[in-house]
């Protein structure tokens, strides 16, 4: 289950990219976050969307 349930506080489109509007979520699944590609082990448990690349500036 996605820990970021944007449907409770806004809208979240998890397709090719993750776009949340008016959402109070601070994290989302790697599959929903553009900064965490499917092969990114750094974000295996989730990530905070800070960028579009898989590095320390993206995930924390």
UniProtKB/Swiss-Prot annotation:
InterPro entries xrefs: Metalthion_dom_sf, Metalthion_dom_sf_vert, Metalthion_vert, Metalthion_vert_metal_BS
Residues reported to bind a divalent metal cation 3: 14, 18, 23, 28
Binding site for a divalent metal cation 1: 4, 6, 20, 23
Protein name (Swiss-Prot/TrEMBL): Metallothionein B
Ligand binding (a divalent metal cation 7): 49, 54, 58-59
Protein's UniProt keywords contain Transcription: no
Residues annotated to bind a divalent metal cation 5: 33, 35-36, 49
Residues reported in the UniProt entry to bind a divalent metal cation 6: 36, 40, 43, 59
Region (Beta): 1-28
PROSITE patterns: METALLOTHIONEIN_VRT (PS00203)
Residues given in the record as a divalent metal cation 2 binding sites: 6, 12, 14, 25
Keyword terms: Metal-binding, Metal-thiolate cluster
Encoding gene (name): mtb
Top-level taxonomy: Eukaryota, Metazoa, Chordata, Craniata, Vertebrata
Ligand binding (a divalent metal cation 4): 32-33, 43, 47
Function: Metallothioneins have a high content of cysteine residues that bind various heavy metals.
A GO term, aspect molecular function: metal ion binding
Keyword Secreted: no
Pfam families reported for this sequence: Metallothio
Protein family per UniProt: Belongs to the metallothionein superfamily. Type 1 family.
Region Alpha, annotated ranges: 29-60
């Amino acid at each position: 289950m996605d820990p970021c349930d944007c449907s409770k506080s806004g809208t979240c489109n998890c397709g090719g990219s993750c776009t949340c509007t008016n959402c109070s979520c601070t994290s989302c699944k790697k599959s929903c976050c553009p900064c965490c590609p499917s092969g990114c082990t750094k974000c295996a448990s989730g990530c905070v969307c800070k960028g579009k690349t898989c590095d320390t500036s993206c995930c924390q």
